[in-house]
Structure formats: C-alpha cells, structure tokens
Amino acid sequence: MELTPREKDKLLLFTAALLAERRKARGLKLNYPEAVALISAAILEGARDGRSVAELMSLGGEVLTRDEVMDGVAEMIPEVQVEATFPDGVKLVTVHEPVR
C-alpha cells in the first residue's frame, strides 16, 4: 500500500485518537497527545460527514472536559488547528480553548 505523507499523518492521528477513546472509555484521564488527537480526529470525521467549519469549531469544544484530562493539560492546549478536507477543498479549522 502506497500512502502519501499526508495520508500517513491522518492514519497516525486516527490511531492515537482510537487509543485515547479507549482510555477515556475506561475512565482514564487523557494526556496532552491523546487529547489533541481525539479533538483533531473528531474535527476530521465531522468534515468527512459534511459539517461546516463553524459547526466543527463548536464541536471541537465539546469533545473533552477538564475532568477528562490530566491536571494542566487544558492549559497546554490554547487552540487546536486541523486542515480538514471538505467537499469544496481543504480548510483550516481552529478551535480556541478546546478543553472546557
């Protein structure tokens, strides 16, 4: 299977998000990479589902709460930026203070 660097990045992100999702389901608090991966994957999947940039900016802030991440992680993530593919092209989605 031949993958472009962008496709490899998306696959790695998805894998990290899947791990984070499983840990969250077990009641574990997520660390920085897990939190960013889970938020980013939610944005990418939302774009794939046909949601708008505005909807995804809102959705990104609903993925995790402060109670679901380790102490200090929320402050380490002032924003998450993801280049997502929409039907009309690639757009940058920015979520400010995603862990609320």
Curated annotation (Swiss-Prot):
One GO cellular component term: cytoplasm
KW Cytoplasm (keyword) present: yes
EC number: 3.5.1.5
Signal peptide: none
Enzyme class: hydrolase
Any GO molecular function: urease activity
UniProt xrefs under PANTHER family: UREASE
Family note: Belongs to the urease gamma subunit family.
Stated name of the protein: Urease subunit gamma
